[in-house]
Curated annotation (Swiss-Prot):
Gene giving rise to this polypeptide: hisG
InterPro entries the UniProt entry points to: ATP_PRibTrfase_cat, ATP_PRibTrfase_HisG, ATP_PRibTrfase_HisG_short
Protein's UniProt name: ATP phosphoribosyltransferase
Function: Catalyzes the condensation of ATP and 5-phosphoribose 1-diphosphate to form N'-(5'-phosphoribosyl)-ATP (PR-ATP). Has a crucial role in the pathway because the rate of histidine biosynthesis seems to be controlled primarily by regulation of HisG enzymatic activity.
Subcellular location: Cytoplasm
Taxonomic source organism: Staphylococcus carnosus (strain TM300)
Written domain comment of the UniProt record: Lacks the C-terminal regulatory region which is replaced by HisZ.
Matches recorded under Pfam families: HisG
Length: 205
């Protein structure tokens, strides 16, 4: 049996929609009707539901054979002992720098994504101070704790409703399928079958 780690939250909703579009209702229904269970089994696949940033850890430690997570998570810690295998056609969004309309000088930036933020401003040759937050990043700009934020944007609605505007898009994000390195060989056929059931080309990058 394969164990697949799924990100809870927005990406899980996108995954369910993707399954439904591809008529994979067995998996979709099992996930939708899981109630509060953190692990479920459907069609010989065990799905475990974890925080998005923890998906690579469960895969790396061998608890899960496969993980589905956002490329944003993988960019923050790129040197994990996993196979960063293929792109998946859902979960599309982007990183953006956002600020109040009247802000002209960005020196302090709040974000959850410290590496992405530091790399971007270093490439621009801009010296900034980074404040790391784990949630509600927009609030830091709203209350003037920082000049700007770097966060994931899908529709921009949350930014606009809090009086912020996108200044620059700094990187695209999508879902990625990752595998445990040992499972990649010991369960190669099962992994290949899982990907085929998703309706995704193994060679799609």
């Amino acid at each position: 049996m394969l164990t697949v780690a799924l990100s809870k939250g927005r990406l899980l909703k996108d995954f369910i929609k993707f399954l439904e579009r591809n008529n994979n209702h067995v998996w979709a229904d099992a996930i939708i009707h899981r109630e509060r269970k953190l692990q479920i089994t459907a069609d010989s696949i065990k799905f475990i539901l974890v925080k998005g940033s923890d998906v690579p850890t469960y895969v790396e430690e061998g608890i899960a054979d496969i993980g589905i997570t956002g490329s944003d998570i993988l960019k923050e810690r790129p040197n994990r002992n996993i196979n960063n295998y293929i792109d998946l056609p859902f979960g599309e969004c982007h990183f953006s720098v956002a600020a109040k309309p009247n802000v002209t000088n960005i020196q302090r930036v709040a974000t959850t994504y410290v590496k992405t933020t530091r790399d971007y401003f270093n490439q621009k040759g801009t010296d900034i101070s980074i404040i790391q937050l784990s949630g509600s990043v927009e609030l830091a700009a709203v209350v003037d704790m920082v000049d700007a934020i770097v966060d994931i944007v899908q529709t921009g609605t949350t930014l606009k409703s809090n009086g912020l505007e996108e200044r620059e898009q700094i990187g695209e994000i999508n879902a990625r399928l990752i595998t445990n390195k040992h499972s990649f060989f010991s369960k190669s056929k099962a992994i290949e079958n899982f990907i085929q059931q998703l309706g995704v080309s193994i060679h799609a990058q």
